[in-house]
Amino acid sequence: MGQKFWENQEDRAMVESTIGSEACDFFISTASASNTALSKLVSPPSDSNLQQGLRHVVEGSDWDYALFWLASNVNSSDGCVLIWGDGHCRVKKGASGEDYSQQDEIKRRVLRKLHLSFVGSDEDHRLVKSGALTDLDMFYLASLYFSFRCDTNKYGPAGTYVSGKPLWAADLPSCLSYYRVRSFLARSAGFQTVLSVPVNSGVVELGSLRHIPEDKSVIEMVKSVFGGSDFVQAKEAPKIFGRQLSLGGAKPRSMSINFSPKTEDDTGFSLESYEVQAIGGSNQVYGYEQGKDETLYLTDEQKPRKRGRKPANGREEALNHVEAERQRREKLNQRFYALRAVVPNISKMDKASLLADAITYITDMQKKIRVYETEKQIMKRRESNQITPAEVDYQQRHDDAVVRLSCPLETHPVSKVIQTLRENEVMPHDSNVAITEEGVVHTFTLRPQGGCTAEQLKDKLLASLSQ
């Protein structure tokens, strides 16, 4: 088994930047919890019936890929596990080997690190096919290394398989909620619709870069194509298309990963398919080729066991602690998925950047709320002032003139004073306005009628003016 990518900080950073922190944590926690490599899981042979069924669903439609997740009970302690069974993905129009960039080289290196970490090889991989790798290709090829335990993962293919109900997500938040640990890859590819349909021995997953409204006829078509007993039967000793699959042995089991253009673009455009030897000798993943490694097929019964004492209770407590930590991480990741769905303009996909973007977004929203509240109060004041304009009466006399201003009480500056006086049964019988150098002095002559003292009335007037 090759070196795990998370054992080297540079490799881990490279992988995390390409597939996302959630997927990186998922791979690490999966390897730590079960210690089950992909080489132990059942890898179905490249059967034409299954491949033709997947191709039939994708070609001539708006779906961009189709995956078959095979339900396999490899280890009774792990329960049912959904692993890659087969797949088909179309190539975008115009994708060619000439459009090659440094990012494509990084993607290939990440795929190689994943292959070495979960399949393993002591020999060098050599690149036999160059060219551009789109984000759709990267999502499709990286999915080869994912597996989903049905007893712990209640989302994605495992959630569909356990519930037995199809799932159709036709918006970005719902798609990200389904993909979860693959959400970084899905967002990069730009998926708008995902369909997950449970069948007899697994789950068929379809994804599209377009928005596709829910159509029950599509679900029925998938069930009719993949729901028959002539397809995969996954049991303790799985058989695929009537062929006995052995978890041991040295025969290579090839998986065809085909990329084909859309039907309407077939004329004058062809691209060779990629053979993926997922598990076994002469492994080749998207142009990477490795030597034979017969030890990958050892089952639990064939592996040499170390002699020694039985594990103490402390070992079980440690395993329980690992499981609790895994569940805690999963719940935390769920919160991040929900946060990512509601925060716009995410700068980066890592958790630290997501939290920083969320804080910035919330702060901006609080500022906008304060501005809106202030504008609302100003508008109310303007509306109240525009209800009834003040009336001006001008009278000319022999030696002088009299100017009389009248306006509604609620719009007058001393309206609060008058209202407070009325509430305390104090009626002003005379008032006078005097102009000084510093302002205006409004004098009221009062005639107390209630039991309110002068000091109490003063406090109430000050309180009303301070509001």
Curated annotation (Swiss-Prot):
Pfam families in alphabetical order: bHLH-MYC_N, HLH
Cell compartments where the protein resides: Nucleus
Record domain bHLH: where: 316-365
Primary site of residence: nucleus
Record carries keyword DNA-binding: yes
Gene Ontology molecular function, alphabetical: DNA binding; DNA-binding transcription factor activity; protein dimerization activity
UniProt induction comment: By UV treatment.
GO BP term (any one): negative regulation of gene expression
Database matches in InterPro entries: AIB/MYC-like (IPR045084), bHLH_dom (IPR011598), HLH_DNA-bd_sf (IPR036638), MYC/MYB_N (IPR025610)
Keywords of this entry: DNA-binding, Nucleus, Transcription, Transcription regulation
Gene Ontology CC: one annotated term: nucleus
Complex formation: Homodimer.
PANTHER family, A to Z: MYC, TRANSCRIPTION FACTOR BHLH3
Protein name: Transcription factor bHLH3
